[in-house]
Amino acid sequence: MAALTQNPQFKKLQTWYHEHRSDLNLRRLFEGDKDRFNHFSLNLNTNHGRILLDYSKNLVTEAVMQMLVDLAKSRGVEAARERMFNGEKINFTEDRAVLHVALRNRSNTPILVDGKDVMPEVNRVLEKMKSFCKRVRSGEWKGYSGKSITDVINIGIGGSDLGPLMVTEALKPYSAEGPRVWFVSNIDGTHIAKTLATLNPESSLFIIASKTFTTQETITNAETAKEWFLQSAKDPSAVAKHFVALSTNTTKVKEFGIDPQNMFEFWDWVGGRYSLWSAIGLSIALHVGFDNFEQLLSGAHWMDQHFRTTPLEKNAPVLLALLGIWYINFFGCETHAMLPYDQYLHRFAAYFQQGDMESNGKYITKSGTRVDHQTGPIVWGEPGTNGQHAFYQLIHQGTKMIPCDFLIPVQTQHPIRKGLHHKILLANFLAQTEALMKGKSTEEARKELQAAGKSPEDFEKLLPHKVFEGNRPTNSIVFTKLTPFILGALIAMYEHKIFVQGVIWDINSFDQWGVELGKQLAKKIEPELDGSSPVTSHDSSTNGLINFIKQEREARSQ
């Protein structure tokens, strides 16, 4: 594929941007088109509620949106989409298909990898998960002392942790009949020590989530958990009743002491950051029930169908992707804020930090050359209204343009005080996007200060600080209620957004070689931390850091 910056549609957008950038004033755009909301919004009607994508508060015109859609078409987005859904090995650096869509393929339409339909295997694992969840949640599954399971501890890292953690937090209102869930990921011993201190080994079930069963952080934490467990259980055979594996390495699983019958498989065409739909989601299913887990899958499948069949002009993931391209590659924006106005979504931005930054944080194209344009943004965010009292100042009056996605449910899970809390939350959500769009003019600020009776001295001093330029772009994503179905649809929407941007940038969104180098060096450094001899095998900084740590440890041990 030719370089993005040489693409005729890209050049057309560049020319338009340089000629018309100064004309893109959101106040004027709204004043000039009283129907702008209807022209730049999308209503997605599902059987489980509606999702509204309002992208009217973006620095775009109908001409810009059409040029962006033309760019997507010229970069082969539609063909790439079909290659993914058809099971082609689009992750070419690892020679793998990319089929998280198969994990939630509720239609059961055959999906082939190397000529073999993967759906029978997908359904077999789902049935196994369903049966296991029923036994644990009903109390039929007993621990070594005859007690039922009250706590499930998921030990994994990256995609084996972030997805299940985010979803179990988001769907807490649906967990009343399920066991509590805990997540241990960090190799820092504090994480597992603090978690184990709260647990009873007799009623704890550990899920060890590692495809290879060799991930250093996960296996170290798993061995620590097993050691803690056996201090109470004494008998190694009891491990089989309290540990299950999400893996493909039967030999290592058996060596650990886990019954292979309690090993739940997934496949090399499931990328870690897209794996919550697979057996990696076992902690989700245990916590909220398998029926709700299936609803999560169904919501994602609904979005998959929308993404696959809807024209690009009305396609939610595509529109989000194109708006991101507009800001990153033309306005020079470097970050993207995800701001969910729902406390249950407090891990949503963290989840998509991995989803987006590990996928599109690349500078090499599929042809092996360095890109000559920006790629993936820095993704960050916190729930509203907390963020308003932390970093919104910079979004409103800072020197950086930060495109934002605001998300909120119309219905709250907790209508306490006759819905007062949620009404205030909704008002803040609506006010922020309006404020970022409109700002406050010098004249408006002047009238405000006059009405407040400020002295001439205060007036002159305060006026510049009271002005808001506005013209800050936002998307508003409003949905009926945060249900398993709607959550599944929202996650899939952002997954496909990331995919579309990767296609336009001509990068492989499904490998993660950037994770490897640090791990390789850590293996070399680990034995160098033993003993007291100074280390000289690295650069002066790394040598100095290692030797400082060794000196401090030795001094404290004397």
Swiss-Prot record:
Keywords: Acetylation, Cytokine, Cytoplasm, Gluconeogenesis, Glycolysis, Hydroxylation, Isomerase, Phosphoprotein, Secreted, Ubl conjugation. The modification N6-succinyllysine is found at residue 454. The active site is at 358 (proton donor), 389, 519. The modification N6-acetyllysine is found at residues 12, 142, 454. D-glucose 6-phosphate binds at residues 159-160, 210-215, 354, 358, 389, 519. Its EC number is 5.3.1.9. It catalyses: alpha-D-glucose 6-phosphate = beta-D-fructose 6-phosphate. This is Glucose-6-phosphate isomerase. It comes from Sus scrofa (Pig).
